[in-house]
Design a protein with these regions (language model features):
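Substrate-gating cap/lid alpha-helix
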Residues: 153-155, 185-234
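Secretory targeting and sorting signals
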Residues: 1-29
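Surface-exposed intrinsically disordered loops and tails
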Residues: 85-103, 191-195, 242-269
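Oxyanion-hole/transition-state-stabilizing segment in secreted/luminal serine hydrolases
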Residues: 92-150, 182
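Structural recognition of the beta-strand scaffold that forms the well-ordered cores
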Residues: 36-41, 45-47, 69-74, 123-128, ...
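Short amphipathic alpha-helices and their capping/turn segments at secondary-structure boundaries
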Residues: 24-35, 60-64, 104-125, 159-171, ...
Length: 297
């Protein structure tokens, strides 16, 4: 049998057909909806740093390492109550990456509307909230009872928040809450180094507050909606012994957990509760690790 050889004109015609078919596929891919990463919370969720305002924080790290498209509803100063009830964000931070404004509605309602409109295209929800509920307790004569009262509100409000997010996003979207570094440990060196005995006592009490009250309440609230909590407090070493010390260039010999919080936050240097860039990066790494542990099951 003789083999038929296609004429050059026929080869060109086939090539033209393939070329015409390809743009259709590319156009379909171009119009495909992205998969979104939705962030809610307080100033930690928008990466606040003193003298810098909003920075990439942990959310940009998470978006980059998951391949998801960030949409950030975070609001500086938010509490577990205001995230549910306050209309608008009175402390809008300029330059928030992928930030969303919602002047006529609450943070949760704005997020719910987005989740509902893009249901089926949500890959991850993260929340950092609760820190502002307990910050004032550090100045109280009896901090632990103050934290106990605040924790009751945290538990109730975050349970409602998580349930609302779950209802809007659907049953399979990972919801990951995050806690905070225990910045009060920085009281060992700020504002006075060495600290007064009362300051050391406050720092010790702060570990108890996070470990036994605040973080368990947050964890229970997120788990109630099929979510989970990454314990940033534990990851930054707050639960380890304060009798172990390390010699630092800036502060001399201090407990290891204190050195950790000094490196990861601004508290020891400025008395500011927010994370430094390495602190936000650590939070991002914890969330990414949890995200993949959940989605690859």
């Amino acid at each position: 049998m003789r083999r038929r050889i296609l004429a050059p004109s026929a080869l060109l015609a086939v090539a033209a057909l393939l070329t015409v078919a390809a743009p259709g596929t590319a156009a379909q891919a171009a119009t495909r909806s992205p998969t979104y990463y939705v962030s809610l919370g307080d100033s930690y969720s928008v990466g606040f740093q003193p003298n810098a305002g909003s920075t990439p924080g942990y959310t940009v790290y998470v978006a980059r390492h998951t391949g998801l498209t960030l949409v950030n509803f975070g609001c500086g100063g938010a509490t577990t109550s205001s995230i549910l009830t306050l209309v608008g964000c009175p402390d809008v931070l300029p330059h928030t990456v992928s930030g969303v404004t919602y002047p006529t509605t609450t943070q949760i309602a704005a997020a719910q509307a987005f989740l509902t409109a893009h249901r089926g295209h949500i890959g991850l929800i993260t929340v950092t909230i609760g820190g502002n509920d307990v910050t004032a307790c550090a100045t109280q004569a009896s901090p632990i009872p103050c934290v106990g009262t605040a924790v009751n509100s945290i538990k109730t409000n975050v349970t409602t928040l998580a349930a609302d997010l779950r209802a809007a996003a659907g049953p399979k979207v990972p919801i990951i809450g995050s806690t905070y570094p225990d910045v009060i440990l920085g009281s060992y060196v700020w504002p006075h180094n060495p600290p007064a005995a009362s300051t050391v006592n406050l720092a010790n009490l702060s570990v108890t507050a996070f470990k036994l009250l605040i973080n368990p309440a947050l964890s229970k609230a997120y788990v109630s909606a099929g979510g989970s909590l990454v314990d940033v407090t534990a990851a930054t070493g707050a639960y380890t012994s304060l009798t172990r010390t390390v010699n630092t260039k800036t502060y001399g010999t201090i407990p290891v957990p204190v050195a950790s919080v000094c490196a990861l936050t601004w508290f020891c240097a400025l008395g500011n509760i927010h994370a430094r860039t390495p602190g936000y990066t650590l939070i991002g790494k914890l969330i990414v690790a949890r995200y993949y542990s959940v989605t690859r099951r």
